[in-house]
Amino acid sequence: GAQLNVLSLTSEENMMTGEITNEQKRIDLPQMTEPVKNIFVDPRQQWLYVINGRAQADVFSLRDKSLNGRYKLLENGDAEITASTQLVGGISLIFGDSKGGLAQWFMARDPDGESRLKQIRTFQMGTTPIVEITAEERRKGFIALDASGKLGVFHSTAHRTLLVDQVVEGQGIFGLSPRANRVIVEAGGKIQPLLLENPHPEVSWSALWSKVWYENYDEPKYVWQSTAANTDFEPKLSLAPLTFGTLKAAFYAMLLAAPLAVAAAIYTAYFMAPGMRRKV
């Protein structure tokens, strides 16, 4: 097995003298029983994700210096994790397996209030192993390449498979531009540039009208929040709260307006002076 050690470096600057003090802390974690394939750390440095070859993720709490849990990533015992990455923001993990499947996982609280790694949504690209996954730098989208040379474009929040196309023959590697509008694929010693037009992948029927499980939420919800100050923001475009709010406002307005209109009509017809009624 492998021994994991986490080294934390902290720098503090004295406001009066400008002197910088460096502090180093070492966190010893339990020894791993399986070979480690990948390691991820969330931006807040709270969780350490260790992916091993048995399609299992060990999650460690860096604050408590303890094991949060061991999570089975695949139900199929014959499959294994072949590729993995973090989405922009570092909260979600995307795993690709040997059967062509992809899954999004992130930490969420269970009914007991404990944080657990949970599978949020899945995608199916084909039947051949996923060899590489790259996340977009500005949106909650990602691109995957399988062993047969198929390229897939996905968006996590909208739960959309935007494109699956054969771009090369056989296994290759690829690179994605910062704006996610160009892809370069290398296979068999040849480089193939591709132009990707993907203007609004975050919009889908489920994103607009269904409950969506957003990052940092404990369950799927209807939420509208179209913008934020940070660049790794996850758009929340549910029209359900807007529609319900509009209908509710109209209903309460009619409760007040309808009796006033009926009372005004009765007064005009039976009690208003004839001269005034002609002017009205």
Please give the residue ranges for each predicted region.
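Periplasmic/extracellular loop-to-transmembrane helix junction in inner-membrane transport proteins
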Residues: E12-P43, K65-A79, A83-V88, E114-R138, ...
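Alpha-solenoid helical-repeat scaffolds
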Residues: G1-N5, M32-V41, Q46-G53
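Transmembrane-helix boundary motif in ABC transporter permease subunits
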Residues: A253-V280
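Beta-strand-enriched, solvent-exposed domains that form extended recognition/catalytic surfaces
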Residues: S98-Q104, R116-V131, D146-S148, G152-H155
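Solenoidal tandem-repeat scaffolds enriched in leucines and small polar residues
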Residues: L7, Q31-M32, Q46-Y49, F60, ...
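Long, low-complexity, acidic Ser/Pro- and Gly-enriched intrinsically disordered regions
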Residues: A2-Q3, E12-N14, W47-Q56, S98-G101
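WD40-repeat beta-propellers
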Residues: L4-T10, A57-L62, L102-A108, L145, ...
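Conserved beta-strand element within WD40/beta-propeller blades
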Residues: G1, L48-N52, L93-D97, F142-D146, ...
